[in-house]
Amino acid sequence: MAVDNHEIVKALQLYASLAELHEENPFKYKAFASGAFNLRKIKEPLFDLQESQLLLIPGVGKSVAKAIVEYAETRRFQALEGLLSVTPGGLIAMLGVKGLGPKKVRMIWQDLGIDTVEELFDACRQNRLVEVSGFGYKTQQSILDAISFSFAARGKFHLARVMPYAESFVKALNLVFGDEKHVFTGEYYRKSDVIERLSLLTTAMEFSGMGEGEWAEVAAEGGEDLQAWHYHESSGLWKHEQGFVMDIQVVPFADFERELFALGAADGHLEKMNYQSADWQGNERDTYVAKGLPYVVPSRREGHREFDRPVAESDLIQFADLKGVLHNHTTYSDGLNSVEEMALYAMEMGMEYLAICDHSKTAGYARGLQVERVLQQFEEIETLNQQLWPFKIFKGIESDILSNGDLDYEPEILSQFDLVVASVHSNLGMTEEKAMQRLLAAIENPYTTLLGHPTGRLLLMREGYPLDHHKIIDACAANGVAIELNANPYRLDIDWRYIDYAMEKGVMVSVNPDAHEKMGYWDMHFGVLSGQKGGLQKSLTLNALNLVEFENYLAKRKK
């Protein structure tokens, strides 16, 4: 198959971008950029043209013409291959992020060591991009938004991204249809970490046989929260401007609860129940009783281990149970708010305590704290504790787990922290054997209080390194180390599927926001939802301890 013009132009543009990225001769990469721009207007197949003919095209010089001929014959040209060989593949994807050109990508690469879109997204979430000269908060947010959009195009979405649109959609329907019922079923009903499709169950008969014209009328009445959804009659699906896809099922009012139960649960849950529609007893609780089974809250209806290790609804963690906020970053490292601002906001939320856990000295990309800065922060915390009593700020650190499993401070420094969150931030491409050696060594370190985001995953962006979760949890149980449920909705790490095993082993789990600004505390809502899916009990949630209980917990560990 012949090379088309678009492919040739794309190759020339890539060369121009990579040449600028690597700071080659500016005259040369500008010539390629100009040539590519002008060639976009050419309709005649470029692969048919000789070099002499190409030179007649405005903006096409000898080097560009030679590259076109070479590419048309071989689907490659030497100059581009040379640059590709010295360019991390992730940088090419970064060049495709809206708002980023070669110069900015180079600055991010050189200053922060970031060479993938996934790492760039994480850096924006942690307010690290603003550390690079020329990048302000507005630019950082625009890049974050652009990356979010590109991820959304993959067809799967974080629960946190979908939730506000889903909730506003139902509220708008309530205004239009009055007393009808509308509930999202499936993954959304179970509050899954990732949503692929929204499925709405409704009693509004207007949706039966609805056409695009009828939907337009309903949307006009419901306002922008409905108008953002476009109905495609050919597929029977609604599509949101942000990329979400939704199907709608209509049922009679009398059948709504029964259908919600069946559609809200995963197939595996219904199979474990041996459930048939004839088993419906008029409500969920009576249906479980009739089957001789304990009631299971909607979020746990996954067919995992909800019947093997049942947890009473009253024992599951709730957001209102949380008394403290652990694992938070301030302006000492890569956070947006000061220690005092973080503390005051935690107090406003009704929390009893806060743990400041800024990045440690190895994390140069995040302005990790050298020892003198640690001691400076200690002094500030002590002063604030006198002013804010009975609220208490604990002196913590998020200490990097080095490649050999050591933490990155000497014991005499580690011993001065109230708590230490041990986390992996570098060399993530590990085998399971290496990852286990590294994490087990950190867990066995007597100064480790909490194992932070155990797998290092970023949902929909980066797979976590492989672990034997049961062995990790066993080690935590043996060493009195708690496990973090990182509540950042892009992490939710530890995965909910392993929480029940932690409960069996008596391992405390801490729902931590990993907040880089005070508003990040609210991410704990997503941590609680994920915890509930795994059967996280209030009694084994570390930051559900009140202040006195938490102080006693830390004191006991230090003995």
Predicted region positions:
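Accessory alpha-helical DNA-binding modules that contact the DNA backbone or grooves
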Residues: 6, 16, 24-198, 202-238, ...
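Short acidic-aromatic active-site loops that bind/stabilize oxyanions
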Residues: 159, 331-332
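Short amphipathic alpha-helical heptad-repeat segments
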Residues: 4-12
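Non-transmembrane amphipathic alpha-helical segments
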Residues: 12-19
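Charged catalytic cores and adjacent phosphate/nucleic-acid-binding surfaces used
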Residues: 191-330, 336-356, 361-392, 403-559
